């Protein structure tokens, strides 16, 4: 059975350094999120642009997955998720979400 996944595209808050963005998200915010019944949680932080390249449109992505859609819906409707969602405002200005069904190929 395929896992249900939420993929978040995140732009850091204006004026926030890359280091503070990483710390607030990876070290602090994840502590609020760990109790949402998820089966996995991956954060990907964008690297500094190479010389001659533009800034990426997002500073990072998160992949969070659950066993099934009911588990995801219960987690997203929980009071704990309300706290986690409010905490995001400390480090992010822009969030876009895509909800997917994962198919592992390799």
What are these regions (language model features)?
Residues 2-106:
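Macromolecular interaction modules
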């Amino acid at each position: 059975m395929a896992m249900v996944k939420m993929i978040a595209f995140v732009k850091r808050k204006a004026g926030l350094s890359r280091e503070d963005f990483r710390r607030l998200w990876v070290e602090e915010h994840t502590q609020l999120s760990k109790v949402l019944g998820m089966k996995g949680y991956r954060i990907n932080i964008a690297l500094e642009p190479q010389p001659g390249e533009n800034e990426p449109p997002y500073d990072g992505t998160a992949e969070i997955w659950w066993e099934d859609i009911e588990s995801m819906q219960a987690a997203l409707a929980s009071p704990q998720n309300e706290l986690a969602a409010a905490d995001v405002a400390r480090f992010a200005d822009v969030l876009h979400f895509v909800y997917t069904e994962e198919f592992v190929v390799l």
